């Protein structure tokens, strides 16, 4: 058990604040809650496993590579790349501020579980059209993350992760599998070009307590760890982090509803095989 007795009461958001932010997806607000939990001196001391590299560090690494002309050609395109990249997602962007209007539309599409890009509310971005199938089942993709974790077809990954945490809050089996062994074939079916980037998410609950109003109260802090083979640090990260924060909040809300114990998310932790930006976004490193 992590002893957070000395943490000031106001470091922990009220559950009403927390609950209201789930559907709002206002990352400035969301990350303020996360900051109270993850970057407080007391929390870092209590949880020594927190990553020390954050989004500013990743930006500085990319900037140094850009200044040194350390450019790689990946699939015919000039890129700046950081391989085997591990960092704390303490901000909702790394290189360029997010398009919140689109991020909300993509979140709605994920929640619909549709595997067709034309079902994205509003207009369908060019990048989704380019990777979707071009014959037979036209417009189909693999990477609807809502389908990946909420659908029966992919094994109800979210429910199994939540059930594992409820059954044993110290479990190491609370995992959501996004990818599948057939992806090498599925990614190019019917002219598609969609080899899913995320392959799994693992969740841990850290049991904590604090003293408030002369009583000891037990609660949990969720560690939500993402594993990806590849991530575009502009189009990918900016939208992915909104999605993962939504899922982390939903996990905490559902865990609390089922157990009666309050749970709060900390920052998302990212592990990426290839974290990169393309040449069209190099200009954002000149600021």
Residue ranges and their predicted role:
Residues 2-287:
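Terminal, non-catalytic protein-protein interaction segments that mediate quaternary/complex assembly
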């Amino acid at each position: 058990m992590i002893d957070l007795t000395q943490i000031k009461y106001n470091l922990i958001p009220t559950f009403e604040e927390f609950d209201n932010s789930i559907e709002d997806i206002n990352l400035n607000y969301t990350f303020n809650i996360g900051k109270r939990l993850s970057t407080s001196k007391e929390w870092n001391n209590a949880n020594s496993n927190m990553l020390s590299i954050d989004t500013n560090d990743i930006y500085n690494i990319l900037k140094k590579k850009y200044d040194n002309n350390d450019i790689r050609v990946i699939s015919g395109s000039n890129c700046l790349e950081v391989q085997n990249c591990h960092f704390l997602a303490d901000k909702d962007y790394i290189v360029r501020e997010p398009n919140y209007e689109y991020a909300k539309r993509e979140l709605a599409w994920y929640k619909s579980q549709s595997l067709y890009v034309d079902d994205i509310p509003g207009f369908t971005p060019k990048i989704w059209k380019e990777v979707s199938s071009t014959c037979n089942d036209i417009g189909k993709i693999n990477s609807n993350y809502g389908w990946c974790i909420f659908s029966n077809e992919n094994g109800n990954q979210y429910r199994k992760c939540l059930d594992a945490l409820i059954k044993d809050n110290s479990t190491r089996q609370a995992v959501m599998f996004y990818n599948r062994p057939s992806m090498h074939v599925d990614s190019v079916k019917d002219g598609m070009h969609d080899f899913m980037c995320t392959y799994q998410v693992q969740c841990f609950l850290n049991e904590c307590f604090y003293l408030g109003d002369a009583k000891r109260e037990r609660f949990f802090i969720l560690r939500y760890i993402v594993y990806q083979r590849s991530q575009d640090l502009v189009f990918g990260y900016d939208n992915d982090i909104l999605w993962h924060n939504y899922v982390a909040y939903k996990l905490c809300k559902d865990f609390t509803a089922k157990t009666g114990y309050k749970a709060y998310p900390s920052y998302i932790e990212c592990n990426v095989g290839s974290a990169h930006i393309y040449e069209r976004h190099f200009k954002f490193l000149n600021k």
